[in-house]
Amino acid sequence: MAGSISCHHGERATEPENPGNVDDNKETGDEKPDGEAGAGNDVVILFTNDLHSQIEPIGKDATYNPDKGGVARIKVLVDSVRAAEKAVIVADAGDFVQGTYYFTCLGGDVEMMVQKEIGYDVRTIGNHEFDKKIPGLKHMLSLNEVTTVSSNYDFSRTVLSNEVKESAIIEAGGHKIGFIGLGVRLSGLVAPNACEDVDYSLPLNKADKIAKELKDNGAEMVIALSHLGYNSDVTFPYYDSGVAAQTENIDFIIGGHTHTFMMKEQYVENEAGNAVPIVQTGSKGIYLGYMKIHLDKVGKQRFSYRLIPVDSRLDSRIDPAFASKLAYYSEKLEQSMSEVLGYCSSTLRKGSPQGTLGNWATDSMVEMCEDVFGVTPDLAVCNNGGLRAEISNGDVTRSDIYAVFPFDNKMTLLELTGTSLLKFFDSMAVNTEPLSAGVRLVIKDGAVKSVSVGGKAIDPKAKYKICTIDYLVESGRYSLDENTSRQDSAEYIYDLFCDHVKKITARGGSLQADIDDRVTVL
């Protein structure tokens, strides 16, 4: 990389989740280049991360960022920049899929078409790219010719050995830009059977070595597409800041995974004394990342970065041919997804240590367990990370339920000893997940002060029936893998919840939940 960027501290990134409504932007959507159009030494990188299958704009009634995002709008911006600049590369930092019924029902076909039509050049693999397991990921990657880089996941023992590259050099406007891909640790995050035979290496064991090889092979700079997540602690090697600080051949990091809205780049000084900018767009395509780099004399004044809002100001310029392709898929799903299943009396939301959505979900799982397995469990638990949307007040459609529960999880009935159940609650005191109403858990200073199930203290020698999801068992979390017996449902959890909502409606009820005393933090 010619020259270096002077080190300074950018503005602090916003919170990774629920950032609130993005500010309205008065631009017209004609994204003009910074400086002279088509300057020969300029390269523009446009990027996304954590799109999570947000094909359509976020709903107009959503609590956060209503009517923001939408891939047709992103294409307007990309086309506009390409028309103004000679050297443009479009990249994605992982989790392009999973989060709406498009992926749940169609397995990535829509998202891969989107990447092809927008013209993505390079991408890396996030944890949710594994959600349809290795055969599903192979199917997705075969649907377009976007270069896939993953430097610390070794796919050589899988059917993806030819589809995923350790690194790549992308040429744009006569310049050679190197790309590496860095992925988060899979253990405990991705079910073992979803990433079978994928070998993980610590990012620092691969990143700098591969970046240097790219430069030795002619790359003028190296950009890491990272799905590690942002954390300001430069001593921690599992996040972007730590990787930047403990390497010397990575020049820029485009991040993901933590859904961090970084309105200003964050600079970290690397081992060579140069400042490495770290950037990230947040999630769901609310913004398109724009980064322009001047390759002749790279310094703070010649590096520019901003997040371009993806909103309704772009609607008049949407490509009709692309819109038609999107409509093909939406119409394919509309009839089943628009089915009204029931009514929600008041909006159900996630929360900690309790939320109305989690309380409703786990209380429902107790009843659903009776329907599926013929057994009333002692308690139910799900994970906050598996609840991907709120349920708004009003009619509840199949698409609403699929938005909350998009994963191909099965309902699971376990039997645990009281000893294992006590260990489970020790974990809940540190990382509280939604629990059903029969639990009374009191937490103080990150530890269990008291706990009971069904109004009784837990007997270490007794056995307890737990209703949960297969993901929590297979990920090895919370001692659930210590079960003495296990049954899995035949149907996926989202279909079971749809049936349950219909059952609530049939008996004249509605979706509702309150915050109660099942979990108390002193």
Per-region residue spans from a language model:
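Acidic, metal/ion-coordinating pockets
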Residues: H8-H9, D34-D311, T356-L357, A361-E367, ...
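Feature captures C-terminal
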Residues: A39-V44, Q54, A62-P66, R73, ...
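Short, compositionally biased low-complexity segments
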Residues: T48, V184, E331-Y343, D395-D400, ...
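A short, polar/proline- and glycine-enriched secondary-structure boundary/capping micro-motif
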Residues: L189-P192, S312-A321, D459, Y478
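Hard-cation-handling environments
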Residues: D311-V396
